[in-house]
UniProtKB/Swiss-Prot annotation:
Keywords: Cell inner membrane, Cell membrane, Ion channel, Ion transport, Membrane, Transmembrane, Transmembrane helix, Transport. Homopentamer. Belongs to the MscL family. It is found in: Cell inner membrane. It comes from Legionella pneumophila (strain Lens). PROSITE patterns: MSCL. This is Large-conductance mechanosensitive channel.
Length: 127
Protein backbone atom coordinates (compact mmCIF):
# COMPACT_ATOMS: atom_id res chain seq x y z
CA UNK A 1 0.00 0.00 0.00
CA UNK A 2 1.37 3.40 -0.89
CA UNK A 3 2.25 5.91 1.77
CA UNK A 4 -0.22 8.43 0.35
CA UNK A 5 -3.06 5.90 0.41
CA UNK A 6 -2.25 4.92 4.01
CA UNK A 7 -2.21 8.57 5.04
CA UNK A 8 -5.55 9.19 3.32
CA UNK A 9 -7.13 6.24 5.19
CA UNK A 10 -5.67 7.50 8.46
CA UNK A 11 -6.84 11.08 7.90
CA UNK A 12 -10.35 10.04 6.92
CA UNK A 13 -11.01 7.90 10.00
CA UNK A 14 -13.76 9.24 12.20
CA UNK A 15 -11.58 9.90 15.23
CA UNK A 16 -9.04 11.98 13.31
CA UNK A 17 -11.75 14.07 11.64
CA UNK A 18 -13.52 14.54 14.99
CA UNK A 19 -10.25 15.65 16.55
CA UNK A 20 -9.60 18.13 13.74
CA UNK A 21 -13.06 19.65 14.16
CA UNK A 22 -12.58 19.80 17.94
CA UNK A 23 -9.25 21.63 17.57
CA UNK A 24 -10.74 24.22 15.20
CA UNK A 25 -13.71 24.75 17.51
CA UNK A 26 -11.39 24.97 20.51
CA UNK A 27 -9.33 27.70 18.88
CA UNK A 28 -12.48 29.65 18.04
CA UNK A 29 -13.86 29.16 21.56
CA UNK A 30 -10.57 30.33 23.06
CA UNK A 31 -10.85 33.57 21.08
CA UNK A 32 -14.35 34.10 22.47
CA UNK A 33 -13.18 33.49 26.04
CA UNK A 34 -10.18 35.77 25.59
CA UNK A 35 -12.45 38.53 24.29
CA UNK A 36 -14.78 37.98 27.26
CA UNK A 37 -11.96 38.15 29.79
CA UNK A 38 -10.07 41.02 28.14
CA UNK A 39 -13.09 43.12 27.23
CA UNK A 40 -15.61 42.49 30.00
CA UNK A 41 -14.37 40.61 33.07
CA UNK A 42 -10.99 42.27 33.63
CA UNK A 43 -12.29 45.84 33.12
CA UNK A 44 -15.02 45.09 35.70
CA UNK A 45 -12.43 43.71 38.12
CA UNK A 46 -10.32 46.79 37.44
CA UNK A 47 -13.28 49.05 38.27
CA UNK A 48 -13.82 47.19 41.54
CA UNK A 49 -10.16 47.79 42.36
CA UNK A 50 -10.41 51.52 41.69
CA UNK A 51 -10.03 51.75 37.93
CA UNK A 52 -6.82 49.74 37.67
CA UNK A 53 -5.83 48.16 34.34
CA UNK A 54 -5.21 44.59 35.53
CA UNK A 55 -3.34 43.50 32.39
CA UNK A 56 -0.85 46.33 32.86
CA UNK A 57 0.01 45.53 36.47
CA UNK A 58 3.67 44.73 36.95
CA UNK A 59 6.63 45.35 39.18
CA UNK A 60 10.31 45.66 38.48
CA UNK A 61 13.12 43.74 40.11
CA UNK A 62 16.44 45.05 38.91
CA UNK A 63 16.19 45.12 35.13
CA UNK A 64 13.40 42.50 34.97
CA UNK A 65 9.79 43.55 34.70
CA UNK A 66 7.37 41.02 36.25
CA UNK A 67 4.01 41.34 34.45
CA UNK A 68 1.78 39.62 36.99
CA UNK A 69 -1.39 41.34 35.75
CA UNK A 70 -1.05 39.69 32.35
CA UNK A 71 -0.44 36.36 34.09
CA UNK A 72 -3.58 36.84 36.20
CA UNK A 73 -5.58 37.57 33.06
CA UNK A 74 -4.33 34.36 31.42
CA UNK A 75 -5.13 32.34 34.56
CA UNK A 76 -8.71 33.64 34.43
CA UNK A 77 -8.84 32.71 30.72
CA UNK A 78 -7.72 29.18 31.58
CA UNK A 79 -10.22 28.79 34.42
CA UNK A 80 -13.12 29.85 32.19
CA UNK A 81 -12.08 27.49 29.37
CA UNK A 82 -11.51 24.60 31.79
CA UNK A 83 -14.89 25.19 33.45
CA UNK A 84 -16.67 25.35 30.09
CA UNK A 85 -15.04 22.07 29.00
CA UNK A 86 -15.96 20.50 32.35
CA UNK A 87 -19.62 21.51 31.93
CA UNK A 88 -19.62 20.27 28.32
CA UNK A 89 -18.23 16.87 29.34
CA UNK A 90 -20.78 16.59 32.17
CA UNK A 91 -23.56 17.36 29.67
CA UNK A 92 -22.27 14.80 27.16
CA UNK A 93 -22.00 12.14 29.89
CA UNK A 94 -25.55 12.91 31.05
CA UNK A 95 -26.90 12.58 27.51
CA UNK A 96 -25.01 9.31 26.98
CA UNK A 97 -26.41 7.89 30.23
CA UNK A 98 -29.95 8.86 29.22
CA UNK A 99 -29.45 7.27 25.82
CA UNK A 100 -28.10 4.08 27.40
CA UNK A 101 -31.11 3.87 29.75
CA UNK A 102 -33.67 4.24 26.95
CA UNK A 103 -35.42 0.99 26.12
CA UNK A 104 -34.79 -0.56 22.73
CA UNK A 105 -37.43 0.49 20.21
CA UNK A 106 -39.99 -2.23 19.56
CA UNK A 107 -39.63 -3.72 16.10
CA UNK A 108 -42.76 -4.09 13.97
CA UNK A 109 -42.49 -7.88 14.24
CA UNK A 110 -42.46 -7.79 18.04
CA UNK A 111 -45.35 -5.32 18.08
CA UNK A 112 -47.39 -7.57 15.77
CA UNK A 113 -46.63 -10.65 17.86
CA UNK A 114 -47.66 -8.77 21.01
CA UNK A 115 -50.98 -7.80 19.41
CA UNK A 116 -51.58 -11.42 18.31
CA UNK A 117 -50.81 -12.64 21.84
CA UNK A 118 -53.21 -10.12 23.35
CA UNK A 119 -55.96 -11.08 20.87
CA UNK A 120 -55.47 -14.77 21.60
CA UNK A 121 -55.58 -14.10 25.34
CA UNK A 122 -58.84 -12.15 24.99
CA UNK A 123 -60.40 -14.83 22.79
CA UNK A 124 -59.38 -17.65 25.13
CA UNK A 125 -60.93 -15.84 28.09
CA UNK A 126 -64.28 -15.69 26.23
CA UNK A 127 -64.35 -19.47 25.79
Amino acid sequence: MSLLKEFKEFAMRGNVMDLAVAVVMGVAFNKIVTALVDGIIMPCVGLLLGGVNIAGLSFTVGDAQIKWGNFLQNVIDFIIVAFAIFILIKLINLLQRKKANEPEPVTPEVQLLTEIRDLLARNSSKI
